[in-house]
Amino acid sequence: MKEIMTDIKLRTWKMNKGRLAKLFIILLLISIMTMLFLYLKDYRVKKYMLNNNKFDVIDIDNYEVFLTGETHTMAKSDEFKKKFFYYLNKNAGVKNIIEEVGFCSGLLLNKYIQTGNEKYLNFYMEQLKGTMAYNKEKYEFYKWLYEYNLQLTEEDKIIIYGIDIEHQPLTAIMGISTLIDINKEVPQSLEEAIEYVKKNDHNAILYLKLAYDKNKEECEEYFGDNFIIFENCIKNLYPEETGSDMRDKVMMDNFSFIYSLNRDKKFFGQLGSEHIYQDYINSDYTSIDEVRFGILLNSNNSPVKNKVYSLLCVYQNINDNSPSKNSFDYSLIKNYKEDIFVDLSQENSPFYKKKYFFKDKKRAWVTCDYIQGLMILIDSNETTSL
């Protein structure tokens, strides 16, 4: 009996051992197949990225607004901005630039690129002292833009528009001064306001509003063709939008106004990356409840719905200090050694099927719901303060 029991135990042990071996082999095969599937999946994505890495593959005729999103402190941002705008200007006829500056302040930048008068650019930059925008790269970009504008015919001249809230009041006042005709008699209702504008005094903001509210007709007569610009300046000095996302709402208000003056024209703008996403998302700086400029541009009420191309700049640094690591997944691009552009919106793009790059899992959308292009910038230095 004892021998029989021992034999049974031995057979049971061998059977269990065989089952375990089979189970191990099955699990091993599943692991290998999973790894192979993931490898092939990543391979297909990476192959797509390498096959769609030229600006020429963008369907530029399909878009009216091209937005690029930067990290403000990265030096390569303005280098890319110059390169991409040059391409769009030459190939898509884009000549309107929207800047992340106040509407009134944008008048000053535009005056500079039309005239080359250094006092406008120098004043603009001086008012940025103490901010991350006070840097050599930004200054040199505007210098380049003026030189480039010189080469263009009158009908092809580049125009800058500010769309942001006014951050620098003195810059805003000097911007408004570019609307003044010094040879024109000033009506009594505007005398004090214009004097403050000429002195670049903070009081100009209050007195311009008082003059506008008191006698709109005289303002219209004095500013002439520039009156609608002046009127929008007043709206920007006293914005009605509120909330943590008021900036993006103001951006949309200003874009709608600018678009009404340039219907069916194309626009380019390089803004902070938070402003360009076309759907709600959690990121390092903004929550999922806050509306973005890109969302508003692509909304049902927008004149450019479905005509917006959002391109995100990401900065892959070899020393592992890449920006936005908490919200951006660098795994697909970690082995790149040179700057590379990727258009994400081609036919059969994997980025229409899954959300790559973004770590936010609260919304089960796909990459192209947020952006349609990616610019990978390798080892960018930080901007150089002036």
Feature locations, PLM:
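Residue-level detector of intrinsically disordered terminal segments
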Residues: 4, 14, 32-34
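Short, isolated positions within intrinsically disordered regulatory regions of eukaryotic proteins
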Residues: 5, 15-17, 148, 369
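N-terminal targeting leaders characterized by basic, low-complexity, disordered sequences
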Residues: 1-7
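Compositional signal for N-terminal targeting/processing segments
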Residues: 24-27, 31-386
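N-terminal Sec-pathway targeting helices
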Residues: 9-30
